[in-house]
């Protein structure tokens, strides 16, 4: 098993996960019952852990870390915009993302009031 040595920025980013979970909770609480919300957040936690692995291995030191930047990045989408070729050439992509993961991310964007049609990963990547 590979041991991950996180930088200070990455450690701070991991702590900021709570901000995202709290934000998701605020937006979903009024729309879903407690059971559905709990199940949704459990699935989201699994997906989000996968996202961090992908992000760390792909971007390393460039990971965003402050609360302000974190919130801004969240509002603008989870990932930096990349071209389709850049996305498909990532060695981690096939391991990290499944179609279910993609749909869950898309649903999170909808619940957070983001434009789901402007998501940089499109359905065509999964066809």
From Swiss-Prot:
<comment type="similarity">
    <text>Belongs to the MinE family.</text>
</comment>
<dbReference type="GO" id="GO:0051301">
    <property type="term" value="P:cell division"/>
</dbReference>
<protein>
    <recommendedName>
        <fullName>Putative cell division topological specificity factor</fullName>
    </recommendedName>
</protein>
<dbReference type="GO" id="GO:0009507">
    <property type="term" value="C:chloroplast"/>
</dbReference>
<keyword id="KW-0934">Plastid</keyword>
<comment type="function">
    <text>Prevents the cell division inhibition by proteins minC and minD at internal division sites while permitting inhibition at polar sites.</text>
</comment>
<keyword id="KW-0150">Chloroplast</keyword>
<keyword id="KW-0131">Cell cycle</keyword>
<keyword id="KW-0132">Cell division</keyword>
């Amino acid at each position: 098993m590979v041991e991950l040595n996180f930088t200070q920025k990455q450690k701070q980013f991991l702590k900021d996960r709570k901000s995202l979970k709290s934000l998701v909770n605020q937006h979903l609480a009024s729309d879903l019952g407690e059971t559905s919300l709990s199940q949704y957040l459990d699935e989201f936690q699994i997906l989000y852990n996968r996202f961090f692995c992908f992000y760390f291995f792909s971007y390393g030191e460039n990971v965003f870390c402050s609360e302000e930047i974190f919130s801004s990045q969240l509002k603008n989408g989870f990932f930096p915009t990349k071209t389709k070729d850049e996305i498909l050439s990532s060695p981690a992509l096939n391991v990290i993302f499944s179609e279910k993961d993609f749909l869950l991310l898309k649903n999170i964007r909808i619940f957070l009031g983001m434009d789901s049609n402007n998501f940089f990963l499109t359905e065509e990547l999964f066809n």
